[in-house]
Amino acid sequence: MRSLLAALLATALAFATGACAASPGGTQPPDVRYGRSVCDGCGMIISDKRFACGYVLASGASRIFDDIGEMTEELRERRPADATVFVHDYETTEWIRAESAVFVYSGDIRSPMGGGLAAFAGRERAEALATRYATTTMTWEQVMARAGTPVPGH
């Protein structure tokens, strides 16, 4: 009876642990503990939600960054085919998928590593910031195409 109870407890624990892990296919954003988690690119503490970002692989493994520009450089170099990429909305700080975000790129955007990128869930707010900084909005594909190029104004 005791061994049956132990087996049932072990099985329940395995299911509970699996439910808390990053889901396969990267459907959930990576786990970032602001003020404690370390950027996988530069080793700095990730503290500004507006620029925190990361990607999750189909295996559930993830990488986190303190700056969108820094992450795009790594993605360009590594080219993981199964990465689901997440960024924060610059104003609401909610996680959003990079492929659906609208980006603003400017040297006037002071991000932790100087990447100059801000992401938005909606076009209207992105265009307002772009107008403020006399620039245009970008798609994720455009951001990746320019990854590694110097930020204007730096």
Question: Can you say where each PLM-predicted feature lies in the sequence?
Answer:
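Post-signal-peptide N-terminal segment of Sec-exported extracytoplasmic proteins
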Residues: 35-72
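Short, flexible, mixed-charge glycine/proline-rich loop motifs
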Residues: 28-35
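Thiol/selenol-based redox catalytic cores and closely related redox-interacting motifs
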Residues: 83-154
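Mature extracytoplasmic domains of secretory-pathway proteins
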Residues: 64-96
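Bacterial signal peptide processing site
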Residues: 21-23
